[in-house]
């Protein structure tokens, strides 16, 4: 008998995702955050289940790794909170203040 060919090849779902580093600029309800990526785009990020179950706190000004789908680049899943260095964190907090000022001036 002839064997059936597997028409649907199994692909790794991680191949459809791209990982970026970003800075949390705003905390929203239900574990959602606005994250500014390295290329200065701002996307909506949500906490992954592993971070949620580990009770890891993510605050404004934290640097995070975020996994973004190739199909919808406006949303991403926060998969890791990067350890912060005091000097870098201070620079980032100044960046956040500048970003807020520029957003306020637009309104």
Curated annotation (Swiss-Prot):
InterPro entries: NA-bd_OB-fold (IPR012340), RNA-binding_domain_S1_IF1 (IPR006196), S1_domain (IPR003029), TIF_IF1 (IPR004368). It is found in: Plastid, Chloroplast. The keyword Transmembrane helix does not apply. SMART domains: S1. GO terms for molecular function: ribosome binding; rRNA binding; translation initiation factor activity. Residues 8-83 form the S1-like domain. Pfam families: eIF-1a. Keywords: Chloroplast, Initiation factor, Plastid, Protein biosynthesis, RNA-binding, rRNA-binding. Residues 87-107 are annotated as: Disordered. The keyword Mitochondrion does not apply. It comes from the Eukaryota. Component of the 30S ribosomal translation pre-initiation complex which assembles on the 30S ribosome in the order IF-2 and IF-3, IF-1 and N-formylmethionyl-tRNA(fMet); mRNA recruitment can occur at any time during PIC assembly. PANTHER family: TRANSLATION INITIATION FACTOR IF-1, CHLOROPLASTIC. Belongs to the IF-1 family. This is Translation initiation factor IF-1, chloroplastic. It comes from Agrostis stolonifera (Creeping bentgrass). The gene is infA.
């Amino acid at each position: 008998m002839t064997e059936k060919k597997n028409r649907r090849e199994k692909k790794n779902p991680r191949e459809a995702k791209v990982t970026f580093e970003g800075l949390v600029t705003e905390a929203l309800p239900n574990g959602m955050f606005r994250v500014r990526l390295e290329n200065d785009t701002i996307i909506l990020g949500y906490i992954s289940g592993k971070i949620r179950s580990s009770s890891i706190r993510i605050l404004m000004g934290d640097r995070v790794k975020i996994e973004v789908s190739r199909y919808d680049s406006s949303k991403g899943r926060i998969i890791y909170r990067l350890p912060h260095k005091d000097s870098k964190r201070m620079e980032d907090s100044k960046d956040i203040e500048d970003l807020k000022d520029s957003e306020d001036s637009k309104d």
